[in-house]
Design a protein with these regions (language model features):
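Basic/aromatic-rich interaction segments and small domains that mediate binding to polyanionic partners
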Residues: 2-78
Length: 78
């Protein structure tokens, strides 16, 4: 596994494949009315696809069990 270095919103775009580095303490859905979800819906190392760029270094990532808002520091590009 090769880390690409610190990610920024300039280095990532919609459609980029990313891997979750570690399981967060909770998940926030990327719906219009967000909800907090338990962290066991996705596992560390799971691969997802960026579907939207958000403010404050956050991205919406689609995994097999849902689309969630995550900080860039929690992800690595593939």
């Amino acid at each position: 596994m090769v880390l690409q270095g610190p990610m920024s919103q300039e280095s990532i775009s919609v459609g980029t494949q990313v891997r979750l580095l570690q399981q967060p303490s909770y998940l926030k859905t990327a719906d219009a009315m967000s909800m907090l979800r338990p962290p066991d819906l996705i596992d560390a190392g799971e691969i997802g696809q960026v579907v939207a760029l958000k403010a404050l270094e956050q991205v919406a990532v689609r995994f097999r069990r849902g689309t969630f808002l995550l900080e860039l520091k929690q992800l690595e590009t593939l």
